[in-house]
């Protein structure tokens, strides 16, 4: 069975509240062999926090429709989980027919 690929999309390149929640979600699902989760945001301070937690990271240059489309083409997620207003808006414009969860 092929893994379901979920891409968590965030605007911030820092590690704070929302970013911590996403890391906890990814870590809680780590033992599920049917799901692969990846964190996607601009590169920055967040990289160190993700490396410490062994979380896959897809860095983007900037949160734009063009850049998110590029990373979607590369990663081929089955689902996008957007965690803030800008990520939700950009993700919705870039996702095509890929389902998106936005909050």
Residue ranges and their predicted role:
Residues 6-7, 95-103:
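Active-site proximal beta-strand in glycosyltransferases
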Residues 82-88:
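Short His-centered aromatic/hydrophobic patch
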Residues 2-4:
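Nucleotide donor/acceptor-binding cores
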Residues 65-69:
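Short hydrophobic/charged patches on amphipathic alpha-helices used for structural packing
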Residues 46-47, 88-91:
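Short, well-ordered alpha-helical microsegments
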Residues 8-63:
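N-terminal strand-loop element at the rim of the active site
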Residues 76-78:
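Proline-aspartate-enriched helix->loop->beta-strand connector
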């Amino acid at each position: 069975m092929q893994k379901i690929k979920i891409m968590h999309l965030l605007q911030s390149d820092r590690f704070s509240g929302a970013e911590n929640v996403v890391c906890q979600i990814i870590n809680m699902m780590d033992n599920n062999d049917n799901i692969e989760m990846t964190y996607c945001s601009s590169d920055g301070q967040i990289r160190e926090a993700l490396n410490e937690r062994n979380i896959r990271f897809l860095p983007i240059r900037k949160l734009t429709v063009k850049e998110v489309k590029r990373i979607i083409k590369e990663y081929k997620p089955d689902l996008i989980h957007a965690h803030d207003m800008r990520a939700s808006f950009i993700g919705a414009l870039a996702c095509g027919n890929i389902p998106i969860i936005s909050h």
